[in-house]
Amino acid sequence: MEAAKKLGPQTAEYTPDMVQETKDLFDLMGVSWMEAPMEAEGAAAVMCSRGDVSAVASQDWDTLLYGSPVMVRNLTSHGTRRFGRVMRAERISLQDTLSEHGITREQLVDLGIMVGTDFHPGIKGIGPKTGLKLMKKHGTMEAVSEAKGFDLPEDLESVRGLFMDHPLGDSAPTATSRAVEEGIREFLQEGRGFSERRVDRAINRLADAGRLRSSSQPSLFDF
């Protein structure tokens, strides 16, 4: 945890109000959530590796470095058009990725550190293709450093540790429930100026998924 606290400021920061508003909206939507002590992808990857969840939905390739057995990209943008092509959800297996490239997870972590992660800017002049070749040839970041003449990061072991054994914390996921339409409308339209049309689309998606209840319907928490 000390390493996490030290390296944490290098990642994106959110205000307490932003975090609380996200929790409030998730509660209104009936979405289960938990607060990770550091990186969301890291905590989710640990949960996936333990079998608590089936996959981690993220655009961040660091998810594989954290050891998630399965990663899903483009989940929320599936079917949309971007840059002239239709986006499709993509399921990525960590084991298949390692086997395809002939490396171990430890080597994948070293490769990620050389290329650049949330915790380290990377080594100048080393991209994914070059880094993979060097890692397969030399085996470790220390050996690559010796062969190519660059200095190792002072916090290398700490960064490795955050990927190989990411902190999960003691927080437990909240319970799931059905979404409350009136509460969502008040939160988004009245409280934050979202257009009625935009909120309607979101409400309709929840209804289509069978996730919506009206305020007149009791929930588990009403008893």
Predicted regions and their residues:
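N-proximal short alpha-helices
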Residues: 9, 13-20, 37, 81, ...
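Short secondary-structure transition/capping segments
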Residues: 45-49, 67-71, 133-135, 208-212
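Long, highly charged, low-complexity intrinsically disordered interaction regions
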Residues: 48-51, 56-118
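Positions that flank functional sites
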Residues: 41, 63, 204
